[in-house]
Amino acid sequence: MTHPDLPRTLRHRDAALRVSPWRGRTDIVVAGPIPGTQPSAAQVHTAVEKLFAAGVSEVYTTALGPPEQQPFIAAGFSHREHLRLLRHDLRDLPTPRAPASHHLRRGWRRDYAEVLDVDAVAFDGFWQFDRRSLVEARNATPTSRFRVADASPLDASPLDASPSDDRTPATPPSGVVGYAVTGRANRTCYLQRLAVHPRHQGVGTGTALVCDALQWAHARRADDVLVNTQEGNTAAFELYLGLGFTDQTNGLDVLHRDNR
């Protein structure tokens, strides 16, 4: 099965699922409801059976809250991973902090290779991004911000640009040690991804990237910022709490179903 054979959206009556390959594989996919929709169990079942008929062997869901999970569980999905969900109300912003070892700048498409190298060592295999995952994270919301922490000298990097400037720098940047993708939809912002190279953790890199995301969200008059993190990622959880996020009660879950 090739990429063109995999539908990006599966529609059944009035509900739809957004579908994408899992880490470049088309025999394993990620599916989730289109924002603002709530499919029934029958609609989920029909959509998944279409995927199985097309040659898909396994389906993972996007991270879902308890109400969103119900039709998938009723359609035969089981829990695979639990995520903690945290929220920042943007009322008391932390003071931006910039470690002397690097600077923050806008991320470019030319950074993707280095960014994905960082991602590969920051997360275990199940959670790692590939290029398509990164692009989808940037495009998941109407507006987004892509920032990188760069350890190269300032005079070796292109000048920063405004969020609306999509020009490509003449000189490709280097020295990426961390990155963040933040998106805004309606009045809520989402810290879609935060990754720091293990060799640069514990020196303020993650703090600087999160503070940047919060400042950006506040400047765009968002009501809050949401972020999720793996249940066992204590370092990230404590980082968010220390910067003013609060733990939400139920969290999120990734569900799974295979073709058996």
Residue ranges with predicted function:
Residues G65-E81, V203, T207, A219, ...:
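Conserved active-site alpha-helix within GNAT-family acetyltransferase domains
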Residues M1-A54:
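N-terminal charged segments
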Residues P33-A100, D253-L255:
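Acyl-donor-binding surface of acyltransferase catalytic domains
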